[in-house]
From Swiss-Prot:
Pathway: Amino-acid biosynthesis; L-lysine biosynthesis via DAP pathway; (S)-tetrahydrodipicolinate from L-aspartate: step 3/4. This is 4-hydroxy-tetrahydrodipicolinate synthase. Its EC number is 4.3.3.7. One of its GO terms (cellular component) is cytosol. It holds the Pfam family DHDPS. The record marks 48, 111 as: Part of a proton relay during catalysis. The active site is at 137 (proton donor/acceptor), 166 (schiff-base intermediate with substrate). GO terms for molecular function: 4-hydroxy-tetrahydrodipicolinate synthase activity. It comes from the Bacteria. Keywords: Amino-acid biosynthesis, Cytoplasm, Diaminopimelate biosynthesis, Lyase, Lysine biosynthesis, Schiff base.
């Protein structure tokens, strides 16, 4: 796969469950078809939004295979495959590659509070274990550690298959350092939907999006508008959906977006503990916005 393909509008796909908490394969296939119709560039199951901490390894492999088969080669299929024990992260990455993932989204090692050298060594072992492209996933709000720009750029220079970073922060200085220092072909993607417009205006390559679960076409148009230099159209799209992008994080992701998809008739409102359903007050806010946008 060309590294230049890891750009554009990517969706951090939710995992639909039945009421008995088994994976709803039929709903999963419907979601893939929804993204094929909308023109989403990359689909990434088994990440944070996919409730990966609650999935077994067998379930993760099955989900990746299902998404790959349903996509029929028309969309790049990545997969979340990371954890905070390097040996386990390597195994998960190998499993995802074997299941058909064309790229690996590997979260920074959380809870352990490693040094930057420890983070480098963690990703070195993952990169040496697989041949598919690796996306470094920097989400310090969840992991408790930041992957510094210098560490990302060092990894990008040292390993040909570390081809992108998902920068899920609002640290614009760090984002600027990544954009200014990256080697040719290395993609910098935002993980913050509200920042798509300014992030891409700075030279970013796209987004791995939560909101693309609900509005894949709009997120695709927003990304493409900025890429094409049509900032007026991008501002119009951003203005229309700004409140929805915020409401998706009114409670812990992916609870709000899965509730919205339930209201849109895409899946059942089911989560695995410790996630629980959206509060009544938050449901009312989400319902109002979905009605305003004509999504329900």
């Amino acid at each position: 796969m060309s590294t230049r393909q890891l750009r554009g509008s990517a969706v951090a796909l939710v995992t639909p469950f039945h009421k008995d908490l088994t994976v709803d394969v039929e709903a999963l296939i419907r979601l893939v078809e929804f993204h094929l119709e909308a023109g989403t560039d990359i689909i990434i199951p088994c990440g944070t939004t996919g409730e990966s901490p609650t999935l077994t390894e067998a379930e993760q492999a099955s989900i990746i295979r299902t998404v790959r088969d349903a996509s029929k080669g028309r969309i790049i299929v990545g997969a979340g495959a990371g954890t905070n024990a390097t040996v386990e992260a390597v195994r998960l990455a190998k499993n995802a590659e074997a299941a058909g993932a064309e790229a690996i989204l590997s979260v920074a090692p959380y809870y352990n509070k490693p040094s930057q050298e420890g983070i480098y060594q963690h990703y070195r072992h993952v990169a040496e274990a697989v041949s598919v492209p690796i996306i470094i996933y920097n989400v310090p709000g969840r992991t408790g550690c930041n992957v510094d720009a210098a560490t990302v750029l060092r990894l990008a220079r040292d390993f040909a298959n570390i081809t992108a970073v998902k920068e899920a922060t609002d640290n614009m200085q760090q984002i600027a350092e990544l954009l200014d220092g990256r080697p040719e072909g290395f993609s910098v993607l935002t993980g913050e939907d509200p920042l798509i417009l300014p992030f891409m205006a700075m030279g970013g390559d796209g987004v791995i999006s939560v909101a693309a679960n609900q509005i894949p076409g709009a997120i695709k148009r927003l990304v493409d508008s900025v890429s094409e230099g049509n900032l007026e159209e991008a501002r119009k799209i951003n203005r229309k959906y700004r409140r929805l992008l915020r409401l998706n994080f009114i409670e812990s992701n992916p609870v709000p977006v899965k509730y919205a998809l339930t209201r849109m008739g895409m899946l059942e409102e089911t989560y695995r503990l410790p996630l629980v359903p959206l509060s009544a007050a938050s449901k009312a806010e989400m319902d109002r916005e979905l009605e305003i946008l004509g999504l329900i």
